[in-house]
């Protein structure tokens, strides 16, 4: 499996990152099977978050790592400071509280990658970067990033860090997929647009894409007259996306692969380092993702797929 480098980590990060938002204690045997298969096929990075499944995602990963005694072999990406019913929580106190609980659940003294799950533009980047750097200095975090931040805020944060001798963000985690959303899938989410991608190309900051396959838009399970999934209709149903689906299917036929594999290859063939968060729940889905990650697309093919 191909890898990318992220500043602050000695270990490389595989370009397929196993998602865990379906991990619960009730399906722990499935969790073990998914993670064992993922490592067996060459993956090493697991995505989770403080809010996933009320903490069960982190807890099951922690249990699995302890039972396998393999903490040093995996890269953990967890996220915190997500808003709650009372509003935004991107502040030093919430970051510290979430991180402490996350590490306890993971049964680890540190996380390799830590991302703020959302942004709060009312909080100065100085406050945020100072707080995160305290945790880096204490050894609780190896590398920091931001999920669902605009590239303008990322640049502002890294400019502040550079000017003040601090560690900056070494990765970003917005949504990036071939299907372009009509509106955010969830409140406060950011999807990488043309300007965001241009910024990543300029800075070469790694992008770890969530929902990289657009919620299954390219599986063949959706069509303009199939309206039963209200969220998919709201977020992804558009004339441009149906044309992107048609083009992906055409290119897939030419290359002898599946349409959804083309959609994954699109994410992994950008002009900057990328990795895709995947939700594989069995061996067949995992192998499909690995095959998709090995597809080479030319710059012209990427341009043709996305520009309608």
Where do the model's predicted regions map?
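Hydrophobic faces of well-ordered beta-strands that scaffold small-molecule active sites
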Residues: 14-18, 46-48, 76-78, 111-116, ...
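Beta/alpha (TIM)-barrel catalytic core signal, keyed to glycine-rich beta->alpha loops juxtaposed to Asp/Glu
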Residues: 125-307
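Short amphipathic alpha-helices and their capping/turn segments at secondary-structure boundaries
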Residues: 1-9, 59-69, 98-104, 158-162, ...
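Residues at alpha-helix caps and immediate loop-helix transition turns in enzyme cores, especially N-
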Residues: 27-31, 57-60, 91, 124-128, ...
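Short, acidic/polar
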Residues: 26-38, 90-106, 155-159
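N-terminal binding-site loop/beta-alpha segment at the start of enzyme catalytic domains
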Residues: 1-74, 137
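Active-site groove signature of glycoside hydrolases
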Residues: 103-124
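Active-site mouth loops of central-metabolism enzymes
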Residues: 19-29, 80-94, 117, 122
